Amino acid sequence: MDTSSINAQSIFDDNAATLKLSWLTGHEGWERGFSADTVGNATSSADLVGHLNLIHPNRIQVLGEAEIDYYQRQTDEDRSRHMAELIALEPPFLVVAGGAAAPPELVLRCTRSSTPLFTTPMSAAAVIDSLRLYMSRILAPRATLHGVFIDILGMGVLLTGDSGLGKSELGLELISRGHGLVADDAVDFVRLGPDFVEGRCPPLLQNLLEVRGLGLLDIKTIFGETAVRRKMKLKLIVQLVRRPDGEFQRLPLESQTVDVLGLPISKVTIQVAAGRNLAVLVEAAVRNTILQLRGIDTLRDFMDRQRLAMQDPDSQFPGKLV
């Protein structure tokens, strides 16, 4: 992953208001950031931000009241040694939290080494939690996929397929039926957790839907605030096909999935043909997926009925064909 854009300046700009940060000294080191090896070897954002630690280099070091109190109780020789070790680690920046006064020697060494030094009245724990969440977001795996991302019945659904199949028209029909648009054409996905992928719309395309013959439609203006969504978790991919290929199955025995950022996402394939109500079919696919997530599999239930009927032809059970 390219980490060149992640530096002290960008992190300060994004978090200054939330964390009430003040840039005390070391402005010349605004380009300081994380090395590619540091990010690659980190198992989580917790490895990149934490309390004062002289063992792990190239991480954001936060000094709270406890660390400052410990520093004040040291001898002059130990203070100088600890400060030298801290600066030698070349952290992206240091944060003195809890409203504590930055030790003069720390300020002096940060100034000489161009190490950014921030201060904040917020507690060290709050600063660390906030920065870890921030780092997990900006360093999370990302991908941009083509399609229309819709909120259908509270489930994030990505409509995909070849150009000209009517994905945008289908999206418009679903929006008119009360569902919400997240993004059209290009959808930015990011894996923020071990079990979910979140999709958003690029700022340039916010609230817009392109329909052939009509051009760009501002969905928020036409249908109202409730017709758009800022983000949704991706739960289902609906692939539109012009005609079934050799691998198309009317009753697939195994659920289809698509790998998105390392996470398997459920997929259904719907054939586009004259006279088919695609909006109703997509809604039905979503409702069926919701049932499957709750442990209800209609096809499996039918196969169980069929097996019982074959084992005991005289048995009477709901749904038996006569």
Curated annotation (Swiss-Prot):
**Keyword Metal-binding belongs to the record:** yes
Q: Which domain of life is it from?
A: Bacteria
Enumerate the InterPro entries for this protein. HPr(Ser)_kin/Pase, Hpr_kin/Pase_C, Hpr_kin/Pase_Hpr_N, P-loop_NTPase, Ser_kin/Pase_Hpr-like_N_sf
- Active site, renumbered: H146, K167, D185, R250
Region labeled Important for the catalytic mechanism of dephosphorylation — which residues? 271-276
Q: What does this protein do?
A: Catalyzes the ATP- as well as the pyrophosphate-dependent phosphorylation of a specific serine residue in HPr, a phosphocarrier protein of the phosphoenolpyruvate-dependent sugar phosphotransferase system (PTS). HprK/P also catalyzes the pyrophosphate-producing, inorganic phosphate-dependent dephosphorylation (phosphorolysis) of seryl-phosphorylated HPr (P-Ser-HPr).
Q: What is this protein called?
A: HPr kinase/phosphorylase
Q: What is the originating organism of this protein? A: Burkholderia lata (strain ATCC 17760 / DSM 23089 / LMG 22485 / NCIMB 9086 / R18194 / 383)
Gene that encodes it: hprK
